[in-house]
Amino acid sequence: MGRWLRLLIIYISAIFRKKIHLTDISNLSFRVWPQEADKKYMNNASYWTITEIGQMDFLFRTGFFKICRRQHWIPLVGSQKMVYKKPLKRFERFQLRSQLNYCDDKWLYFEQTFLKNEQLIANSLVKVIFRGKSGNVPVSQILTSLSTEVNLPRKALIDDSESIDEKLMTR
């Protein structure tokens, strides 16, 4: 299924699905389609496309997307890391869990987990900033605009003593 069609389906379904809080986990179900696979396994680019769709579902269902449109803010990815544990084959069903994991003064960090039958397939960490007309939007302003009490950890998921690969695979 094409990226834009999936995004349209997610947008429409978000209207009818339960709204979530900024600290909740967004769960989506997918299937690997032939155009997403090289030979017989889902390719790396498709994993990233799915993470973007998961992030958009999160933004739609938290109400953050409406605020971004009203404020003319756009999300920009600063960095992203994916660790693959097992491959997904054509036509296999899998789930994507997306959550806002922590923040600092400038960045929001999303963790996204690919699961098949509750088994870890891959895990990603995506660092996102929002930019408005006058530059980068501070996280404090973002949280204020959501008019909700949020207690996100303000400490990094990964410290200097361990690698991101090890941390993402043990979650």
Predicted regions and their residues:
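Short beta-strand segments
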Residues: 30-32, 93-96
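Small beta-barrel nucleic-acid-binding modules, principally OB-folds
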Residues: 68-90
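Catalytic strand-loop segment that frames the active site of acyl-thioester-processing enzymes
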Residues: 2-54, 162, 166-171
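HotDog/MaoC-like acyl-thioester-processing domains
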Residues: 1-15, 84, 88-93, 99-171
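Generic structural detector for well-ordered beta-strands
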Residues: 29-33, 83, 129
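A general secondary-structure signal for short beta-strands and their flanking turns/coil
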Residues: 23-25, 77, 93, 107
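A broad, low-specificity signal marking well-ordered, structured residues that form hydrophobic/aromatic
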Residues: 26-30, 75, 80, 124
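Active-site helix/loop of acyl-thioester processing domains in fatty-acid/polyketide metabolism
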Residues: 46-69
